[in-house]
């Protein structure tokens, strides 16, 4: 595996911009213009994202989202609804030839960096087992959100999911991104979702709490975004033997990201397509 990577901290940005930047990095890396990239980012305003195969209108209460001043966007990856609020988000972009293996194998390798980041914080995390493909569309409606079910090789603390990831591949480039929960407001999350009929919200929230956790809960103290960023950067470097060189988006990446916001991620013909 290539071990010289670029490290990006792009701060907190709107949802469409975050997804556009991930895609722009993948395009630039595919052209050989930038090295493999580990990016950390946040969301401002907080936003709901849905997986590529989901229905925005079927999953999200857009009236509640807009009333709260939140954003919304469809991801280029699969998986289920996430409310990006009190979290650290990461993305990894690397060509398939530089990180050989199928989806599960590369997912496991990237998860080694995440697991080491947890160790940097003192969180006793472990990787989930099983063979559930991270690209799978959401299962039945009883699974309400990303963090109530773990895919293979996702991070758990005491059997409860603390980070969720998804991967896609295009033109020989791997893009994997995921959310690491610093904390969570479960009632707020459920107010922004369309819930299955006939199942009380209280029951679904209880299930969610039983299956998910946060860094704050695991450590018994708040964890800042910057503290988590630094810990996971150190974890990736240590576990994968990387040399991480801090950098910035190139001018072309910035321009292509803006074009993608205007033509794709900021548009209803993408976000409402299903």
Curated annotation (Swiss-Prot):
It is an enzyme of class 2 (transferase). It catalyses: octanoyl-[ACP] + L-lysyl-[protein] = N(6)-octanoyl-L-lysyl-[protein] + holo-[ACP] + H(+). The keyword Acyltransferase applies. The keyword Ion transport does not apply. GO terms for biological process: lipoate biosynthetic process; protein modification process. One of its GO terms (molecular function) is lipoyl(octanoyl) transferase activity. The record marks 161 as: Lowers pKa of active site Cys. PANTHER family: OCTANOYL-[GCVH]:PROTEIN N-OCTANOYLTRANSFERASE, OCTANOYLTRANSFERASE LIPM-RELATED. Catalyzes the transfer of endogenously produced octanoic acid from octanoyl-acyl-carrier-protein onto the lipoyl domain of GcvH, an intermediate carrier during protein lipoylation. This is Octanoyltransferase LipM. The gene is lipM.
